[in-house]
């Protein structure tokens, strides 16, 4: 449950989305940080944000706001945990060509998403996996507190794919 018209988002809707996204990320990060601090060897915490935080989208206000909270949380965690050798980064995927997306959108809508961004493609789940491995590796040891957009350049685009209301 992520999309609804702004005027239809009641308090329960907001609380559910914030709990599912921001609060759970914070609690998981807390548990990871405590374990890493106890081991004393540093580590990497990778949060999952969303490309929805980079530009407004109809019907995605609560989801985008919750994910934007993850971006700030990531920076705060990086500042607090960095002196202990713990890096914290966030990955912000755009629309990713998962089975769920394939089931939700027809071929025409998927093509419109591809054409609406500079690389004329969509992120594949495997690409997010490779990005995660890189960020967790020593090759990225100087990266912390960053939001890494993995959206085929969609955040740069002036056009958006056709909007779909939550009921479509």
What is the meaning of each model-derived region?
Residues 50:
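Residue(s) in the substrate-gating loop at a strand-loop-helix junction
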């Amino acid at each position: 449950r992520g999309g609804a018209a702004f005027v239809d988002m009641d308090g329960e809707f907001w609380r559910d989305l914030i709990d599912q996204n921001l609060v759970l990320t914070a609690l998981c990060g807390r548990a990871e940080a405590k374990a890493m601090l106890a081991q004393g060897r540093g580590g990497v915490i990778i949060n999952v944000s969303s490309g929805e935080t980079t530009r407004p989208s109809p019907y995605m206000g609560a989801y985008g706001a919750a994910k934007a909270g993850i971006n700030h949380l990531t920076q705060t965690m990086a500042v607090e945990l960095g002196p202990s050798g713990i890096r914290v980064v966030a990955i912000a995927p755009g629309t990713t060509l998962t089975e769920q997306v394939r089931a939700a959108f027809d071929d025409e809508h998927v093509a419109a998403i591809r054409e609406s961004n500079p690389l004329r493609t969509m992120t594949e789940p495997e690409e997010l996996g490779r990005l995660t491995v890189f960020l967790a590796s020593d090759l990225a040891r100087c990266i912390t507190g960053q939001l890494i957009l993995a959206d085929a350049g969609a955040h740069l685009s002036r056009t958006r794919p056709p909007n779909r209301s939550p009921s479509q």
